[in-house]
Amino acid sequence: MPIRHCIVHLIDKKPDGTPAVLHARDSELAESAAIENLLADLNDSYNAKQGKAWGFFHAESGAYPFSGWLKEYFDGSQDFTSFSRVAIKHLQTLMEASNLSTGGHVLFAHYQQGMTEYLAIALLHHSEGVAVNAELDVTPSRHLDLGQLHLAARINLSEWKNNQNSKQYISFIKGKNGKKVSEYFRDFIGCQEGVDGPGETRTLLKAFSDYVEKEDLPEESAREKTQTLVDYATAQTKLGEPVTLEELSSLIDEDRPKAFYDHIRNSDYGLSPEIPADKRTLNQFRRFTGRAEGLSISFEAHLLGEKIEYDEAAGTLIIKGLPTQLIDQLKRR
């Protein structure tokens, strides 16, 4: 993963309402194994985050100047350090206006993954821990806590440059229930939501269910294809990459690689050729779950119709082949 440019600034903002203080770095970080490890860990943490949203830039304006500065950097009108410094000052201003925000170290990284260039921006926080030093004393230790990554965005620079009609070249952490605490960061990027990741994923899964029904697939084949879809989509979310419908179609049916893709296109589901899969929605598709007072049921989707029968009119489930452990417990009751 070649790192083209990387820099870290610090915005010191206390929760007591005092003005935020900016400590801006004057030069880029030198290449090092530590920087490479940091960015790799950041990517892993970011890709694993649930609740991300996808979108595109607002038109450049006084309220949303970030895309203009990014364009100047990308066109060579200003260097990376200058771009990051003017951007971090804008973030400082927005932080001061937000009562919900706290400061921290802000990372800007321009890197390449495969043939694609990205810009990652993340607000990093620290955690206090302990360490053992060379004298074998236990001492306090402060470290970056990427598990507490709540404000971050990633811009697909290649997509932004080459596909002006795209509405999903920016991804950002939206937070649980779209927390307002993240709004100032989204405004800093100047991003508007263009793609509903969970909604697109639900539509994809609906299209797949319709396809299985239309093809009248045997139970074993349907189960295998379901697993193929979930495995591929889950792998793409871990990589931070979208689900490509044509690639998915070829994996679902190697003998007829266009069959599922043609089904989607001919049925007009309104799906884009590439969609950002939502991990939470995929997990729900993998299993059926339900809870009531004193009762919890969870089973894999492919068991429905095989070991589990659902009677909608009666509101009952019939479970065949109970686990031996459960049978033993029932006998001992």
Curated annotation (Swiss-Prot):
Entry keyword Cytoplasm: yes
Family matches, as PANTHER family: NUCLEOID-ASSOCIATED PROTEIN YEJK, PTHR38772
Protein name per Swiss-Prot or TrEMBL: Nucleoid-associated protein PSPPH_1145
Keyword Cytoplasm: yes
GO cellular component: a single term: bacterial nucleoid
Compartment(s) of residence: Cytoplasm, Nucleoid
Biological source species: Pseudomonas savastanoi pv. phaseolicola (strain 1448A / Race 6)
GO molecular function annotations of the record: double-stranded DNA binding; single-stranded RNA binding
Family: Belongs to the YejK family.
InterPro entries: Nucleoid_associated_NdpA
Top-rank lineage group of the source organism: Bacteria
NCBIfam families listed in its UniProt record: PRK00378.1 (NF001557)
Keyword annotations of the record: Cytoplasm
